[in-house]
């Protein structure tokens, strides 16, 4: 495994750990999700370019489209929760809360 692959895998792992450990605020969760998507995009692009897979060259672009949709939905949810409750805690997303 080359150094670049190892760095991308570590970036994905650190983002996943950040998502699991710092999940009280929604903004930090969204940033960790974006870090995971960015490392996946770079890793998939490197694998496709190194293996010369021409049929799978659209997969990283599709991943970027899903990442943009995820970011837009996450930011709109962040704005909605922060205007409704005045803070960006993830625990405010519970619909069963009285």
From Swiss-Prot:
It is found in: Mitochondrion inner membrane. One of its GO terms (molecular function) is NADH dehydrogenase (ubiquinone) activity. The chain crosses the membrane at residues 1-21, 29-49, 61-81. The keyword NAD applies. One of its GO terms (cellular component) is mitochondrial inner membrane. It is a multi-pass membrane protein. Its main location: mitochondrion. It catalyses: a ubiquinone + NADH + 5 H(+)(in) = a ubiquinol + NAD(+) + 4 H(+)(out). GO terms for biological process: ATP synthesis coupled electron transport. InterPro entries: NADH_UbQ_OxRdtase_chain4L/K, NUOK/Mnh_C1-like. Keywords: Electron transport, Membrane, Mitochondrion, Mitochondrion inner membrane, NAD, Respiratory chain, Translocase, Transmembrane, Transmembrane helix, Transport, Ubiquinone. Its EC number is 7.1.1.2. Core subunit of respiratory chain NADH dehydrogenase (Complex I) which is composed of 45 different subunits. Belongs to the complex I subunit 4L family. Core subunit of the mitochondrial membrane respiratory chain NADH dehydrogenase (Complex I) which catalyzes electron transfer from NADH through the respiratory chain, using ubiquinone as an electron acceptor. Part of the enzyme membrane arm which is embedded in the lipid bilayer and involved in proton translocation. This is NADH-ubiquinone oxidoreductase chain 4L. It comes from Platyrrhinus helleri (Heller's broad-nosed bat). The lineage of its organism: Eukaryota, Metazoa, Chordata, Craniata, Vertebrata.
């Amino acid at each position: 495994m080359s150094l670049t692959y190892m760095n991308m895998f570590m970036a994905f792992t650190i983002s996943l750990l950040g998502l699991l450990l710092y999940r009280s605020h929604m903004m930090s969760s969204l940033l960790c999700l974006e870090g995971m998507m960015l490392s996946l995009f770079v890793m998939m692009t490197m694998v496709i370019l190194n293996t010369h897979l021409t049929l799978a060259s659209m997969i990283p672009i599709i991943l970027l489209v899903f990442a943009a949709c995820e970011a837009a939905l996450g930011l709109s949810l962040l704005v909605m929760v922060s205007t409704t409750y005045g803070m960006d805690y993830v625990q405010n997303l519970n619909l069963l809360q009285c």
